[in-house]
Amino acid sequence: MEIIKDLPEVFEEFAEQRQKSFLAVKQLKDKGIPVIGSYCTYFPKEIAMAMGAATVSLCSTSDETIPAAEKDLPRNLCPLIKSSYGFAKTDKCPFFYFSDVVVGETTCDGKKKMYEYMGEFKEVFIMELPQSQKAEVLDLWKAEILRFKEYLEKKFEVTITEEQVREAVKLENEVRTSLKNLYGVMRHDPAPIKGHDLFRVLYGSGFKLDRTLIADEVDALTAKIEKEYAEGKREDKKPRILITGCPIGGATEKIIDAVENNGGIVVTFENCSGAKSIDRLIDEDAEDIYQAIAERYLSIGCSVMT
């Protein structure tokens, strides 16, 4: 696959992917395809993908719905949680509206309370995430993944086979590898592209409901960036900044702009919408694929585990 468009146009298309998928998710529902929504990178999407479901990240990146959320939740609660709950409560997130089930996880206390309230108007499946990454809790997390599999089988009256799970693992590994190779271009100094353009691809790819298309598109983009870099098209040499912490998107993209409008360049997103979600792969050849899935997800770096 070769990209014939200019890079700015490609970056803009990824930036618009979330809005494009509003219509796409309705079309999936009309076809009878299950939609599974989630808020966290600990969500083992391969299990849902194995049964042919579409997985989608739910809205939580604007302060627009916080006033509605504060009618139920404490005002001093994390704004990310209030935004998530507000979008859900007001039906302003099409992805939430069309989700057959929302998968929650026991990370922080605020999200636990959010899911409790959310369960009053939406079906929510809670995965009990161990608050540790010690080896002895791995069996507990594997059991939760199997419980999630059994829940999906019962709810949607399907059988999820090991072969289907392995196929989903292979597909998602390809997506992660492609995205990892993409942000690897930022090793160049000076950088080949702006950090905000990199972010648009990382963030927008999460809203592409057909996961089979992502790897080829991103690989082609990476090749084009490298080609243009070799031809001398690159940013000026600038201070290189790493962003870590909570997810970024929507209103919080102003953090990227604050850096890049003042002489710096963001070269890495070491957070939930960046490296944390794509750095580690699942061992496709593992004898016990569910154990491999559990190991991969439990090894994600998150402050809730410390």
Kindly label every feature range from the protein language model.
Residues 73, 139-147, 281-287:
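Short, surface-exposed amphipathic charged segments that create phosphate/polyanion-binding patches used
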Residues 37-46, 105-111, 245-250:
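Gly/Ser/Thr-rich loops at beta-strand to alpha-helix junctions
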Residues 75-92, 302-306:
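Glycine-rich, highly charged phosphate/nucleotide-binding loops
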Residues 79-85, 144-153, 286-297:
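A polyampholytic, Gly/Pro-enriched intrinsically disordered region
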Residues 85-154:
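Acidic/His-rich segments in extracytoplasmic proteins that coordinate ligands and/or metal ions
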